[in-house]
Amino acid sequence: MVSSNLQELIPALSRSIRQLPLHIETQKVLEFYCRNSSYKSLLVAQDISEFEKHNDHKYLEALIQKTHFLWDNPLPPFLKRFQLYHKELTNHWPYEYQRSLLSMSNPRKESQGYLWRDGKELALSNLRFEKHRWADENIIERLSPEQGTQLLHSIFHQYFFLKSHARLCYNNRKIPVPIVEIPLRPMGNDVADCRIRNLFKRKTAVVWNLLAWENRPLSTRNEQLLGEIITKSETRSMRRLYQRASRRAYVVTNEGKDPNGLQVPEFRPGEILQMSI
């Protein structure tokens, strides 16, 4: 909802949006969300103000990304299920004791943490939907072991894809290990249970934010729209602007075949990354 004070500013904000060197489809979507959300209106107004002040196109790129990669880009079905069953997944999140490395003959090949750090696909084969002993017993169990395992595989397949394609990640950063690693105290025993519970909560929150917000897959509809803008816009500057804004695009290849998110998704870099302008 838009507050009454901000509602008075919407016409002026709409005029500012229409004056930006953005494609008309982007302008339409921005205006729609500004009319219906005070928070989004403020974000758009801030980016417009910074662009007008500095004449820096990175603020236009930010508007394109907010529009086509977040606000008008729905979560794929498996991420909606991640959101729906977040607390239950926290109770079953994969983990590894750091002390277990001491008993391994070759931790580099046996440790789940090392397999993830080294980007080894073997890490995906060891996922199990098993309730750990730090679980919150007040959470109602709704997923069967098969459903939970499938959902974990969907989540971790997206994570593995991003880890294997660091250039597509937000800020081109290396992403952390997605499992919980339970550390040791200096004396060699495990840390307190309350701290371990917080590790599970933080880890699932970090993975959710990384997959759903910082690096959300682009819908095939939006990939097609952005592809048309990049190839058919009248000015080269607009084509280049949209291609820069889409430099981290990737999609779920079996998106339309699984509306309920019951299959493990497959991913590929966006075709718009390869388009010549």
Swiss-Prot record:
The name under which this protein is listed is Genetic interactor of prohibitin 5, mitochondrial
Which locations, inside or outside the cell, does it occupy? Mitochondrion
Predominantly, its location class is mitochondrion
Q: Which Pfam families match?
A: GEP5 (PF17053)
Got a GO cellular component term for this one?
mitochondrion
- Source organism of the structure: Zygosaccharomyces rouxii (strain ATCC 2623 / CBS 732 / NBRC 1130 / NCYC 568 / NRRL Y-229)
Protein task:
Essential for respiratory growth and required for maintenance of mtDNA. Required for cell survival in the absence of prohibitins.
Q: What is the lineage of its organism?
A: Eukaryota, Fungi, Dikarya, Ascomycota, Saccharomycotina
Q: Which UniProt keywords apply?
A: Mitochondrion
Q: Name one GO biological process term.
A: mitochondrial genome maintenance
